[in-house]
Amino acid sequence: MANTGRIPLWLVGLVGGLAVITMLGLFIYGSYSGLGSSL
């Protein structure tokens, strides 16, 4: 991959971190409300 520098590394980490937190939050909320048992 060519490092063009158009996207800051901290921005990629921030978006990735928010995505992981959102997925974990939805999974915990789904399992807490009983919807996670159907997955």
UniProtKB/Swiss-Prot annotation:
<keyword id="KW-0150">Chloroplast</keyword>
<keyword id="KW-0793">Thylakoid</keyword>
<dbReference type="InterPro" id="IPR037267">
    <property type="entry name" value="PSII_PsbJ_sf"/>
</dbReference>
<keyword id="KW-0602">Photosynthesis</keyword>
<comment type="subunit">
    <text>PSII is composed of 1 copy each of membrane proteins PsbA, PsbB, PsbC, PsbD, PsbE, PsbF, PsbH, PsbI, PsbJ, PsbK, PsbL, PsbM, PsbT, PsbX, PsbY, PsbZ, Psb30/Ycf12, at least 3 peripheral proteins of the oxygen-evolving complex and a large number of cofactors. It forms dimeric complexes.</text>
</comment>
<keyword id="KW-1133">Transmembrane helix</keyword>
<keyword id="KW-0812">Transmembrane</keyword>
<dbReference type="GO" id="GO:0009539">
    <property type="term" value="C:photosystem II reaction center"/>
</dbReference>
<dbReference type="Pfam" id="PF01788">
    <property type="entry name" value="PsbJ"/>
</dbReference>
<keyword id="KW-0604">Photosystem II</keyword>
<dbReference type="GO" id="GO:0009535">
    <property type="term" value="C:chloroplast thylakoid membrane"/>
</dbReference>
<dbReference type="GO" id="GO:0015979">
    <property type="term" value="P:photosynthesis"/>
</dbReference>
<keyword id="KW-0472">Membrane</keyword>
<keyword id="KW-0674">Reaction center</keyword>
<keyword id="KW-0934">Plastid</keyword>
<protein>
    <recommendedName>
        <fullName>Photosystem II reaction center protein J</fullName>
    </recommendedName>
</protein>
<feature type="transmembrane region" description="Helical">
    <location>
        <begin position="9"/>
        <end position="29"/>
    </location>
</feature>
<comment type="function">
    <text>One of the components of the core complex of photosystem II (PSII). PSII is a light-driven water:plastoquinone oxidoreductase that uses light energy to abstract electrons from H(2)O, generating O(2) and a proton gradient subsequently used for ATP formation. It consists of a core antenna complex that captures photons, and an electron transfer chain that converts photonic excitation into a charge separation.</text>
</comment>
<dbReference type="InterPro" id="IPR002682">
    <property type="entry name" value="PSII_PsbJ"/>
</dbReference>
<comment type="similarity">
    <text>Belongs to the PsbJ family.</text>
</comment>
